[in-house]
């Protein structure tokens, strides 16, 4: 089996309804997977039931069987029994903390490596990389490790934008990612803009959507990745 992982920048683009823009990206992963487990651990400011209801409504057109992992007495067994895994956005630190708490990090990696489809957005995409060291989120809780699912061998930065409001004197996103590359010049970071996604199918990695992505690695800073690019070279360990 091969990895089949869709890594969305966000749950919305502009003023579109929840997950509406992502339906064309998500649908191919659901052809042979109807029973999905949703992991809402990144949701801190809402109940898990409320979060689950939003996802079920947003994906209702696909007619999937979606349950929340919080509804199951054994989270590990729930992941094993599902045809696919959904992880939503919110706070990445809280998400990873809970994944470690329930001993799910290794299990999810193993299940996805065996071919179980994975769909994440925002924080759910952050945890798909090597670590969460390039998240935008506030560290409201300390997970045992920053090491993440390693579904792709690089770092992600969802919601990427280098916009700086006039008069604002804080660092831009590009400056923050430059800091990462100064500490770790060998690990690539891909900034994915809202409305876009990365799709890994085995040894193939594609950029989906109508927005470019941006690469940061060593001396390479904010290098545009054109719409529709094949990024399979980022999966090679030699990078």
Curated annotation (Swiss-Prot):
Catalytic reactions of this protein: Dipeptidase E catalyzes the hydrolysis of dipeptides Asp-|-Xaa. It does not act on peptides with N-terminal Glu, Asn or Gln, nor does it cleave isoaspartyl peptides
Enzyme class at the top of the EC tree: hydrolase
Keyword Protease: yes
CDD domains in the cross-refs: GAT1_Peptidase_E
GO biological process annotation, one example: proteolysis
Residues forming the catalytic site: 122 (charge relay system), 137 (charge relay system), 159 (charge relay system)
Record-listed E.C. numbers: 3.4.13.21
Predominant localisation class: cytoplasm
Record key words, sorted: Cytoplasm, Dipeptidase, Hydrolase, Protease, Serine protease
Alphabetized GO MF terms: dipeptidase activity; serine-type peptidase activity
Places the protein is found: Cytoplasm
Disulfide linkage: none
Cytoplasm in keyword set: yes
One Pfam entry name: Peptidase_S51
GO cellular component, one term: cytoplasm
NCBIfam families recorded: PRK05282.1
Record family assignment: Belongs to the peptidase S51 family.
Free-text function comment from the UniProt entry: Hydrolyzes dipeptides containing N-terminal aspartate residues. May play a role in allowing the cell to use peptide aspartate to spare carbon otherwise required for the synthesis of the aspartate family of amino acids.
Descriptive protein name: Peptidase E
Organism this protein belongs to: Shewanella baltica (strain OS195)
């Amino acid at each position: 089996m091969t990895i089949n992982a869709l890594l969305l920048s966000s749950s919305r683009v502009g003023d579109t309804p929840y997950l509406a823009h992502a339906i064309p990206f998500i649908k191919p992963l659901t052809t042979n997977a109807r029973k999905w487990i949703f992991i809402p651990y990144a949701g801190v400011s809402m109940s898990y039931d409320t979060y689950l209801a939003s996802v079920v409504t947003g994906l209702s057109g696909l007619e999937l069987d979606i349950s929340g992992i919080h509804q199951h007495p054994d989270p590990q067994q729930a992941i094993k029994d599902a045809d696919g895994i959904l992880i939503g956005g919110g706070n990445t630190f809280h998400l990873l903390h809970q994944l470690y708490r329930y001993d799910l990090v290794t299990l999810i990696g193993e299940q996805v490596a065996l071919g179980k489809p994975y769909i994440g957005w925002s924080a759910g995409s952050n945890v798909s990389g090597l670590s969460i060291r390039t998240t935008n989120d506030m560290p409201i809780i300390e997970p045992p490790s920053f090491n993440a699912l390693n579904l792709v061998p690089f770092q992600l930065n969802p919601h990427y934008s280098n916009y700086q409001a006039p008069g604002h004197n804080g660092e831009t996103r590009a400056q923050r990612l430059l800091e990462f590359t100064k500490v770790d010049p060998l690990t690539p970071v891909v900034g994915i803009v809202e409305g876009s996604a990365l799709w890994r199918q085995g040894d193939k990695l594609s950029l989906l959507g109508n927005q470019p992505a941006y690469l940061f690695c060593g001396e390479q800073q904010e290098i545009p990745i054109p719409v529709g690019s094949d990024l399979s070279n980022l999966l090679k360990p030699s990078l």
